[in-house]
Amino acid sequence: MTSALSACGGKGSNIKEENVPADSMAYSIVKKAKGDSTLYGLACDGCTDSVVVFLPYEGGDPVTYEIIDARRLGKVFGRPKIGDRLALLVNPEDKEEALLVINIDELKGAWCNTFMPKFRDLDKMPRRLQRRMMADMPDSIKQKFLVPKELGFELKGTNTITPIGMRMRAETTDEMSPVEYPKQKRYREWRIYNGHLLLATKKHGIDTADIVLLRPDTLILRFKDKEQGYYKKLKY
């Protein structure tokens, strides 16, 4: 790794899903998962808004890829800095162009959102009764139970995930509470695969997400059925 960093002139899992190999989460910065066309490496000196200078983990000299169209189409996620770990998808028809760039070092970290609870079985009531119930409810009750909760996850460099704001198991007090929070999956592992973000749970397989936006303080992911935004949490 030291030699790779010098070349750049700066610093330095098992799941199942359709069309994804069972060992695709066994991530290595040197050895890619089977079927993954993503290139992994380091950002080198010379990266600009129009090109990325990239040193692949496989070795060799730095390669310059054009990213003008990728940036125009919103497919450059994060700003490559010298020594940052990157994931690239190269245009199969033009080996000098990257179609997608992900700054893995900017993607890592703790990402959260604030969720409001709702009263149990409220959805089963007609909307008119829901509005009446909320209007007639004393403010003291609302303040006691309608408390926002911060939930999220930390993407670690080891490709593991630490949940944020989630208990290991449901408690009796949770079941007795008149409110409930949106259910959150407890992800355990993550990786990039063909430009997608794979999030794996222990019991429920993988969720595949596409990155919509990645900024130092903001992450938006597009899942199969929704888009979810997160803010970066520096300490928790």
Where are the regions a protein language model picked out?
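Beta-strand/loop nucleic-acid-binding surfaces
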Residues: 61-77
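N-terminal helix-cap/turn-to-beta initiation motif at the start of protein domains
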Residues: 77-80, 97-112
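C-terminal motif of bacterial Sec signal peptides marking the signal peptidase cleavage site
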Residues: 4-7
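N-terminal glycine/threonine-rich, aromatic-flanked beta-hairpin/loop signature
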Residues: 20-42, 46-50, 60, 123-193
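Short, charged beta-turn/beta-strand-edge "cap" motif at the junction between a beta-strand
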Residues: 49, 90-97
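Bacterial signal peptide processing site
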Residues: 9-11
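Short nucleic-acid-contacting surface segments enriched for D/E, G, S/T with interspersed K/R
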Residues: 73-87
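Edge beta-strand at a domain terminus
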Residues: 106-108, 182-186, 216-236
